[in-house]
A protein has these predicted regions:
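Hydrophobic alpha-helical membrane segments
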Residues: 87, 94, 109-126, 143-148
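Alpha-helical membrane-associated segments of multi-pass integral membrane proteins
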Residues: 134-151
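Core segments of alpha-helical transmembrane spans in multipass integral membrane proteins
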Residues: 50-60, 78-103, 115-118
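Membrane-helix boundary connector in multi-pass membrane proteins
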Residues: 103-109, 121-139
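Cytosolic juxtamembrane helix and N-cap/initiation of the first transmembrane helix
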Residues: 5-21, 27-53, 78
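Membrane-interfacial loop-to-transmembrane alpha-helix junctions, especially the N-terminal start
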Residues: 43-46, 105-114
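Interfacial loop at the N-terminal end of multi-pass membrane proteins
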Residues: 65-84
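Membrane-water interface at the C-terminal end of transmembrane alpha helices
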Residues: 25-33, 125-126, 146-155
Length: 155
């Protein structure tokens, strides 16, 4: 991950990067055992991570070109598709491992997984890449990680 000065300095990209970064920070805080309150919500973080991570993973595995074109203003080549498919299958496997309760502490794993993805995914994309920041493009990723962070620290 580059620590260079952000390439994208417009308010939309900086604001959305902040949204997903706050979500990532909340997820890391929850990983350490930190909480900021208790909400009785109908979904927990592990379920949320399985659904959102599993759907993104399936999308990147089965239709990488579609997802890349939906989210970024860059030409897609066979290398992009390869890396997207490779990432997608790992997301699907993580979802399976969470679902199968194959971790000692699925909550901590979900926090760590989603926290890392928040920073390496939408936050980095908003700061350094050419994401399509639209409601049908990249904006939902920022919101998903923020919601994941809120779920994590209020469980």
């Amino acid at each position: 991950m580059s620590m260079a000065i952000p390439k994208n300095k417009d308010n939309l990209n900086l604001g959305l990067a902040a949204v997903s970064a706050v979500g990532g920070a909340l997820l890391f805080y929850a990983y350490t055992g930190g909480r900021i309150g208790k909400l009785n919500l109908p979904v927990d973080l592990v379920t949320f991570a399985m659904v959102s991570g599993g759907l993104y993973g399936l999308g990147f595995f089965l239709a990488p070109k579609v997802l890349i074109e939906m989210n970024f203003s860059a030409p897609v080549d066979k290398y992009h598709e390869f890396v997207a498919r490779f990432s997608g299958i790992h997301m699907v496997l993580m979802t399976y491992f969470l679902y199968g309760n194959l971790f000692v502490n699925p909550f901590q794993v979900a926090c760590l997984w989603m926290g890392c993805l928040a920073f390496l995914g939408p936050t980095q994309a908003a700061l350094y890449m050419e994401p399509k920041q639209t409601a049908t493009g990249h904006i939902p990723a920022h919101v998903l990680f923020f919601l994941g962070g809120v779920l994590a620290v209020t469980s």
